[in-house]
């Protein structure tokens, strides 16, 4: 698809046309119909030639169609900019600068191929009498046709000047072919006499050659191909041809020898295909990452209280055995003094209880001793005794009797009691 450009950018680098050079709509339609009619007759003739499958390289846009008279294959270079036009007498291939502008077409009799870069838009065509093929790669803009009789290569002066494709030249006998539908990378349609394959290259031409060609492009004006008005749309590409035309190739055409400076290295073609694959693969990964983020952002729905009433089954709550408050790291001074006083009172009370117990034990022991002493005294007072006043009697007493006689302190008794006769012991 061609990106719509602003009017200021479309008119950039274009020279004003005189009233006699302005295209007439009726004449343009007649020329376009003539080109379509002749291209259809030539394409039916191409089906009868020998078929050799061409080698296609990845190109995001439609590729050029090589007409039956071209002995050189199309070689495509990656250039998004406008391409130069090659006239019949041009001995050297024009080099293209990267520009979003149109691409060239090679008119009949042009001996050298135009070089263009990969473009998603329509690609240049090689008319029946052209001995050299166009070298094209995808370019985002439409392509102009080269007019017969131009003495040298032509190139647009402004790299970024987006020009519309002019009306088809009467000498150009084939319409644009849109080959983007046949293959995702795009394939070129080879003519019966072109055995070479197109080779994309990303190397731009030297700066000196670009400057010289830009100067030539400013001076040259094609008399046979009028440029369209700003509001006029360029003719669109024709629908792609069947796959049989892509394989047609003639054995009698000479091989195209490319200059070493313009040969694209094989590594760059592989790199271009890898880059295209990476772009295609990277696109579906972006929505996948967004889906993962959306899943992570989903809020966790908390569970309600269990029917059994056991609250520890809730993950946010703990069991009762775990609901013990830990001792805080710091306590207030008043609380600390209160706890110290309580500990002191508890210790004093324990000591008081111990002393009370010891005192009771001591008092009990003293009572026992006192009771024993009083009992012995009571027993002595209650004894029945006989006072022996005559000591000679004691001498006459036998030893057995003397054993039973105990000596007592009877002085107090004698003084308290009047002397009486002691009762003899039985």
Curated annotation (Swiss-Prot):
Highly expressed in testis. Also expressed in heart, liver, kidney. One of its GO terms (cellular component) is nucleus. Residues 33-49, 339-383 have a biased composition (Basic and acidic residues). The keyword RNA-binding does not apply. Keywords: Chromosome, Citrullination, Coiled coil, Nucleus, Phosphoprotein. It is found in: Nucleus; Chromosome; Nucleus, Nucleolus. Its main location: nucleus. It comes from the Eukaryota. PANTHER family: COILED-COIL DOMAIN-CONTAINING PROTEIN 86. This is Coiled-coil domain-containing protein 86. It comes from Mus musculus.
């Amino acid at each position: 698809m061609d990106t719509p450009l602003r009017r200021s950018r479309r008119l950039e680098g274009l020279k004003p046309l005189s009233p006699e050079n302005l295209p007439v709509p009726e004449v343009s339609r007649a020329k376009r119909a003539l080109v379509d009619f002749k291209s259809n007759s030539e394409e039916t003739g191409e089906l009868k030639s020998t078929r050799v499958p061409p080698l296609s390289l990845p190109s995001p846009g439609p590729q050029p169609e090589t007409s039956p008279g071209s002995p050189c294959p199309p070689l495509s270079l990656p250039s998004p900019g406008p391409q130069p036009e090659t006239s019949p007498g041009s001995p050297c291939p024009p080099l293209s600068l990267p520009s979003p502008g149109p691409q060239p077409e090679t008119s009949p009799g042009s001996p050298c191929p135009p070089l263009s870069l990969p473009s998603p838009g329509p690609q240049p065509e090689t008319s029946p009498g052209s001995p050299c093929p166009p070298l094209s790669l995808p370019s985002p803009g439409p392509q102009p046709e080269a007019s017969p009789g131009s003495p040298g290569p032509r190139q647009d002066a402004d790299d970024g000047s987006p020009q519309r494709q002019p009306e088809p030249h009467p000498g150009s006998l084939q319409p644009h072919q849109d080959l983007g539908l046949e293959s995702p990378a795009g394939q070129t349609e080879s003519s019966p006499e072109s055995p070479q394959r197109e080779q994309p290259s990303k190397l731009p031409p030297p700066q000196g050659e670009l400057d010289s060609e830009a100067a030539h492009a400013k001076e040259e004006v094609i008399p046979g191909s009028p440029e369209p008005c700003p509001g006029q749309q360029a003719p669109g590409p024709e629908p792609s041809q069947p796959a049989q035309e892509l394989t047609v190739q003639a054995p009698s055409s000479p091989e195209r020898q490319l200059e070493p400076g313009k040969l694209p290295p094989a590594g760059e073609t592989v790199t271009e295909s890898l880059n295209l694959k990476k772009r295609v693969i990277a696109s579906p990964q972006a929505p996948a990452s967004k889906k993962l983020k959306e899943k992570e952002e989903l809020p966790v729905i908390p569970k309600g209280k269990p029917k059994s009433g056991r609250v520890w089954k809730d993950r946010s709550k703990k069991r009762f055995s775990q609901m013990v408050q830990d001792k805080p790291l710091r306590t207030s001074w008043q609380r600390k003094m209160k706890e110290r006083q309580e500990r002191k009172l508890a210790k004093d009370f324990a000591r008081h209880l111990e002393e009370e117990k010891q005192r009771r034990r001591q008092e009990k022991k003293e009572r026992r001793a006192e009771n024993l002493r009083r009992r012995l005294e009571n027993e002595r007072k209650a004894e029945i005794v006989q006072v022996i006043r005559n000591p000679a009697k004691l001498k006459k007493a036998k030893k057995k009797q003397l054993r039973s006689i105990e000596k007592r302190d009877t002085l107090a008794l004698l003084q308290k009691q009047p002397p009486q006769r002691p009762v003899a012991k039985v």
